[in-house]
Amino acid sequence: MTLATRYFAEQVLRKRPNLSLEICRVVIENPLRISPQEDGRIRYWGWATLQNEAEPRILRVITLEDGTTIHNAFPDRNFREDAP
């Protein structure tokens, strides 16, 4: 079972209806890159095909410190695989 913060459930999914918990979970389980934030949250980047889209995109998923509770997610147009 994938958990989500109230913010994700009430705000993010409303603003980005092409996202889902399942899509975010796939990114967390198969990341291209993982990076901790100063506040303890964890950023994951990975390929995901969003609902109603034909081509995969890079999605950034931010979890709480536990690494499983999803707090935010969005397509990241600025991601570069060769960047640190």
Question: What kind of feature is each model-predicted range?
Answer:
Residues M1-P84:
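Ribonuclease/tRNase effector modules and their secretory precursors
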